[in-house]
């Protein structure tokens, strides 16, 4: 094999082979044959490098985690702090180099812990770490507010040997502060940018997590989703995003919006990388009651479902009504993707109707649920902080923003915070009625009916539109996405790059029932391997006329 770019000839068997050898603690010798695609340490090309590329290089002694962290820090300086100024990275973990050095020593002495050993990962800024970093959800009001312990998923990533490189920027309060608003803006970071065309939105609220992976500022990242906050940034930034079933990953230690819709997921440049990160995070957690439902339904390793032959015979539905029609360019690429799925042996059921899918009615019920749950969840999170926080209640946050309006409210208001504060408790009939409507119409009388009547394994649709221009006066020009039914029902999604429209990435989303991650991973991986549609960003200032 010739000297090619990282990631170029590594199929699923390489991923499984390397993972098995790492787990077994075997010597480096059997891996030399897989190393031909890896450059020497002095010219290791981190751009588009996968977890397997990196692990092969590390196992062969051609790279170490400390060097990898240094490479990413240099790229962050060149692309995030200067140059295109992406503003994807909220802050750097001051201990990242020391952690990487310790993990390198452990690798030399005892071998790697997992596929994530020594792999740098960014966390969305609403995921708690009890270290030297802040956890603020992009809000100045939470600067100095210290969590008492790491979020559970952070504990699991650390146990797997991941290097927490830093915190990724995000839409402030996970895009639950005002309407209108601008995705990717926060008082702490300012406006983050889409790396493909810099004056375009990165979407949100997991903006920085997606940007950083797209721009090769980190190997993989963690985000959260309530309704579209992983899937939309994945689509417009040309990366893979996995939004798991609610309860598959713990939300303990995550600044919340919704107890019934929030979930923690992964971003990668490939389905394999995002899947490897997901595998490290799943499992029951006594700190999050929602995970109790996952007992016996989770897998310790989702990598086994990376099957390039996962498409033949799969029944995939196409929900035209409500999921297509808001972007001709996205529709065109989605239709091309559907043709690929059909050519690769999938049985396409087109069209499929999801009953009771009235976006206006569902959104009205959803916002009611979120207002109630946000107030309850944020107050509980703030009450559990260590001493010294400058805010302890949602009302404190609102008043802080009023006192410091120049910094906190320069473009938009905080009407969602105010509306949430006006709500009562979670025993309020208005809340209970709205929640029942969301679950019933989104799931068992909506998405579930379409899946069952058509005997589907999954559905597929455009992820969202190509990225729209950033507008700090009028806010986002959001027209639609694939997230709504899954958000209301708590179901999983995987967005995969499907191509580009005028230089802007477009994704397609695979949608499934609760706990159907194995099926979705098979389908997403099969499509990815058939198309290889991802292209690295070019950092254009604007689109050519």
Task: Give, region by region, the residue ranges found by the protein language model.
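N-terminal secretory signal peptides
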Residues: 1-14
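Short glycine/serine-rich loop/turn segments
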Residues: 116-264, 289-293, 317-321, 454, ...
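Glycine-rich, small-residue loops and helix-cap segments
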Residues: 61, 118, 124, 159, ...
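Structural helix-boundary/capping segments
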Residues: 78, 163, 214-320, 335-343, ...
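Short, well-ordered beta-strand elements within core beta-sheets of diverse protein domains
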Residues: 53-60, 141-145, 262-269, 510-511
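Short helix-loop capping/hinge segments that flank enzyme active sites or metal/cofactor-binding pockets
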Residues: 117-137, 303-319, 369-443, 448, ...
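Short connector loops at secondary-structure junctions
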Residues: 346-365
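Short, well-ordered alpha-helical
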Residues: 2, 18-143, 173-175, 292-303, ...
